[in-house]
Amino acid sequence: MISRTRQEALDKAKTLIEALPWLSALHGKTVVVKYGGNAMTDPDLRARFAENIVFLRYAGLRPVVVHGGGPQINAHLERLGVESTFTAGLRVTTPETMEIVRMVLVGQVNREIVGLINEHGPFAVGMSGEDAHLFTAERKYAMVDGEPVDIGLVGEVVDVQPGAVRSLLDDGRIPIISSIARSAEGGVYNVNADTAAAALAVALGAAKLIVLTDVEGLYADYPVNSELISHMTASELEEMLPTLSSGMVPKMEACLRAVRGGVPQAHVLDGRIPNAMLLEIFTDEGVGTMVLPDKDPAGGDA
């Protein structure tokens, strides 16, 4: 009779063997991870996230992290007595607010992520989207009742220069990138981290885009139907977009943009689940929702 301890060891070995085809397929491939939500504020989840990213690196993948920092920005604005408002789900970013956003994302959040990862080795290197002209953005307007509304220094990424990121990856490093972008005129913009991550994934020719959220993934007809959609095509997602909640729209638009731009797979995962990334990447079952390119009539990707 096999002891409980021996059985647990055998189960672990089975899990490792199950990962073999995924390790083989993804060895040397780039994976862009958008990090945000509750996973950024819970100390245990933050530590587990750092471990997962380092695991990917040791497993032979080339992880890149793009992060936001909404909760931390809100906390600093409140502490400094600066009022923050939202229009159509987007933060109205005055020059005063932009200064705080930049300080928090680049000077606090980025450094914390770099520090957590580097507890496991000299891997992480912090960057702003401004550095080496990585992200260039143009002003974005919110749409209210079909009319464009000025929301200040909020930008949409229109150009990506990924050379510096590639150099870091080639050197075995893990780039950690804050979602700040330059303008062609020399200013700075606050950009959505989901869309920035998607743009970078396309520019790098990444094998996967992974977006961490505070929900399990995309539901078939929430709240009427809470059945999780495990996978869907780009066209199916595009058809579903108008029905989604405002919080899910930028995340799913990022997935759509990524696969339409040539990224083979985009995933939305619950960052509150410990090791969710590893479950999605290295197991047959996976977790969350995976978006795939459309198939052409010949059976290949469109």
Curated annotation (Swiss-Prot):
This is Acetylglutamate kinase. SUPFAM superfamilies: Carbamate kinase-like. One of its GO terms (cellular component) is cytoplasm. Catalyzes the ATP-dependent phosphorylation of N-acetyl-L-glutamate. Its EC number is 2.7.2.8. HAMAP family: ArgB. It catalyses: N-acetyl-L-glutamate + ATP = N-acetyl-L-glutamyl 5-phosphate + ADP. InterPro entries: AceGlu_kinase-like_sf (IPR036393), AcgluKinase_fam (IPR004662), ArgB (IPR037528), Asp/Glu/Uridylate_kinase (IPR001048), Glu/AcGlu_kinase (IPR001057), NAGK-C (IPR041727). One of its GO terms (molecular function) is acetylglutamate kinase activity. It comes from Thermobifida fusca (strain YX). Keywords: Amino-acid biosynthesis, Arginine biosynthesis, ATP-binding, Cytoplasm, Kinase, Nucleotide-binding, Transferase. Substrate binds at residues 69-70, 91, 190.
